[in-house]
Amino acid sequence: MYFYNVYGKRQICRGDMATVVGIFEDCILNKKSLPVVRPGSQTRRFTHVKDTVNACITAWIKNKNAHYSVASDKSYSIIQLARMFSSKIKYLPARLGERFLSALTLTNLNNKIIRLKANIKLKDYISDFLSKNQTI
């Protein structure tokens, strides 16, 4: 199974393996600007950990011997994601070799055997996070 930008409770928020959602959450909690690598139009598909686990369970139950791409069907740019947090943004220089589009294409999505819809929406997750942490 291939997982794409999994986010949720207990995600990695610092270091080389940190998720972008986790990095942004950590910045909010520490009252720092959100770091966005220029140009910010890079797109990613973000999938909540509970939706990822549901996909794994479904694959196990179906007992299919295949490769699965587990990702939301909606892409967001990094700048769109940052704006969902309603915080200051700090632009970082572009990185050599930065991927601009989600690695998951429509072809990958159409070839999935497991067809599940994301139950947890990224915007709802972020709104919930902000409402729980606005006094911090």
Predicted regions, residues:
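Conserved short acidic donor-positioning loop in nucleotide-sugar-dependent glycosyltransferases
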Residues: 73
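Amphipathic terminal alpha-helices
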Residues: 117-136
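Flexible, glycine-rich beta-alpha linker
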Residues: 1-19
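Alpha-helix C-terminal capping segments
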Residues: 57-62, 80-87, 108-113, 129-133
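Alpha-helical substrate-binding/gating segment
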Residues: 6, 22-35, 43-69
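Non-catalytic, hydrophobic alpha-helical segments
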Residues: 52, 56, 70, 81, ...
